Amino acid sequence: MKTILIFLVVISLMYSGEAQEVAHTYCGRHLADTLADLCFGVEKRSGAQYAPYFWTRQYLGSRGKRSVVDECCFRPCTLDVLLSYCD
């Protein structure tokens, strides 16, 4: 009986961890509202912290060329991806 209880606890913990990483598609107003809710209170970087345009384009890689719509509307994304657009 004790092993069954431990097994059920382990399974429930594994399931709850996976549930947090479920990807959804966010488009249009739903995308804007979700970003607003997630980013509310997140401190934005000042302009002085940004690199010059020529340096930024050179070192950004593929992530810098994608938009939030590319990543979360055209295909599913997690809340962690959306949070990366808050700063």
From Swiss-Prot:
Chief location: secreted
Coiled-coil portions: none
Record keywords: Cleavage on pair of basic residues, Disulfide bond, Hormone, Secreted, Signal
Cystine crosslinks: C27-C73, C39-C86, C72-C77
InterPro entries: Bombyxin (IPR017097), Bombyxin_B (IPR027285), Insulin-like (IPR016179), Insulin-like_sf (IPR036438), Insulin_CS (IPR022353), Insulin_family (IPR022352)
UniProt xrefs under PROSITE patterns: INSULIN
Location relative to the cell: Secreted
Single Gene Ontology MF annotation: growth factor activity
CDD domains recorded: IlGF_insulin_bombyxin_like
Family annotation (Pfam families): Insulin (PF00049)
Function: Brain peptide responsible for activation of prothoracic glands to produce ecdysone in insects.
Miscellaneous comment in the UniProt entry for this protein: Silk worm has two kinds of PTTH: 4K-PTTH and 22K-PTTH; there are many forms of 4K-PTTH.
Family that this chain belongs to: Belongs to the insulin family.
Protein name: Bombyxin B-10
Organism: Bombyx mori
